[in-house]
A protein has these predicted regions:
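N-terminal helix-loop segment corresponding to the beta1-alpha1 unit
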Residues: 1-156
Length: 156
C-alpha cells in the first residue's frame, strides 16, 4: 500500500537536527528525500556520539535515526557545477527543506525567490531558530540557533 506522500520528491539542504527531523517525517510518510551533504564533511551530525557499530563500522546513532529512509549525495553548492546540479534537482522536486544559517543560500543565489523561478510549484520550507518571514524579521532573525539557544533565551 502506498504511503500518503508516495510520489513526492523532497530536496533536503539540511544539517544537525531541525531539517533532518522535518524531512525524516516526510520520508516516513513515503516521500523520496534526497539529502544534500558537503563533500568530505557531510552532515556534522555524523560525528556526534553515541556511535553504534554494525559490521565493524561505527556510525552516529542520532544521524542514522534522523536520516532514515533518505538518499544522500555529496554536493558542493558553492561552485558553479554544484549549483547547476542542485538547480536541476530542484526543477524536478516538489519540496525543498532547508535549515542552513539564515541568508546563506540567498548569498549563493539558491534561496526561495531564486528557486521559485526554476520551479513555480515548489514548496520551500526554511527552518530557523528566530524566524525569517519576509517583511516580519525580528532583531535576531539572521542569527543561527540550536534548541539549547532557544531554551536559554526563553528561560527554560
Amino acid at each position: 500500500m502506498d504511503r500518503p506522500l508516495t510520489g513526492i520528491r523532497v530536496i533536503a539542504l539540511e544539517q544537525y537536527m531541525a531539517g533532518p527531523y522535518c524531512s525524516m517525517l516526510l520520508a516516513d510518510a513515503g516521500a523520496e528525500v534526497i539529502k544534500i551533504e558537503r563533500p568530505g564533511i557531510g552532515d556534522p551530525r555524523r560525528s556526534i556520539p553515541p556511535f553504534v557499530e554494525n559490521n565493524g563500522i561505527k556510525k552516529a546513532g542520532g544521524f542514522m535515526a534522523y536520516n532514515r529512509n533518505k538518499k544522500s549525495i555529496a554536493l558542493n553548492i558553492r561552485n558553479d557545477e554544484g549549483k547547476k546540479i542542485y538547480q536541476d534537482l530542484v526543477k524536478n522536486a516538489d519540496v525543498v527543506v532547508e535549515n542552513l544559517r539564515p541568508g546563506s543560500v540567498d548569498k549563493l543565489g539558491l534561496g526561495y525567490h531564486d528557486l521559485k523561478t526554476l520551479n513555480p510549484k515548489l514548496i520551500y520550507a526554511a527552518i530557523s531558530g528566530f524566524g525569517r518571514l519576509e517583511g516580519y524579521e525580528g532583531p535576531d532573525s539572521k542569527r543561527p540557533a540550536f534548541d539549547i539557544v532557544a531554551e536559554a533565551m526563553s528561560g527554560i
